[in-house]
Amino acid sequence: AVEAARTPLFARQVHGEKQSWLEVRLDVSRQWGLDEHRMKSGEAIWPGTGYIELLAEALAERGIEGPFEIEDLTFLRPLHVPDGEARTVRVTLAPESGGHGLAVDSEHPTGLLRHAEAKVRTLRTAEPVALDIAAALARCGERTLVAGDRPLRSAQEDNLQFGARWQVLRSITFGRGEAIAKLALSEAFVSDLDQGYRLHPALLDIATGYAMDLIDGYDPADGLWVPMTYGKMRVHGALPATIWSHVRLDTSKGLGPGYAT
C-alpha cells in the first residue's frame, strides 16, 4: 500500500509485506538541499544535516511528536546526485528496544546502498536550560567578526559551493576552545519554515560547522572536513529563522590529527 506524505521532503509512505518505509526522490531541480550544497567540482551532495531533517520528518510522518534524542548517527557513504539524474531514497524507522533504528538507503540497479544509520528515542524531560548568551559572549572575547552588507563567509566555503540559503552567519565571537555565533535565514527563505522544515539543513549545517578554526592545525587548504558521526543530539523543537550556536572543542577524546569533536 502507498500513501502520500505530509512533510516537505518525503513524497510517499510505502507499506510492504514485511517492512514500511518513507521515500524521497532527490534531484537538484526539486531539492535546494542538493542544489545549494556542492563540492568545488560542482557535484551536488546531500548534506549531513539533511539526514537529521529526514529523521525529524520521518518521526512526524509516523505521528511521533515532541522532543527526541538521536544517538550514533553515522555516515557510511556520501549521497551524490548528478545534475539531470535522480535518486530514490528510502528512510526506514524500525521499532527496537527503547526507541527506533533509522536507516537511510538509496535505490540502485544492483540493490540498496546504505548511507546512514542512527538510533532515535523520544524524550520525556523538562525543557533544557537556556544558553546564557551574554556570559558566552563575555568569555569569547578574543576575536569577533560581524557581518556587514553580506553574511560572513563560512570556513568550509574553501571546499564547498554553498547556495543562498547557506548564507546565514551574522556574527562569530571566538574564545579559547569555544565560539558563539548568531545565524539567521535571509528573509527570502523564512518561508521554508512555513513549509514544514523542522531542522533547516542549511541553518543547522553552518551552526555546527562555523567554528572549525578552533581545531588545532586546521587549514581549509588541506581539504574538506566532513562529519563522520553525531554521538548524541537532543532536539526539543523546530529551529526558528534566527538562532545562536555555541560550539565547544572537546580535546579529551584524543582522536589524533585530522579528527575533532
Describe each PLM feature range.
Residues 1-261:
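Acyl-thioester-processing domains in fatty-acid/polyketide/NRPS systems
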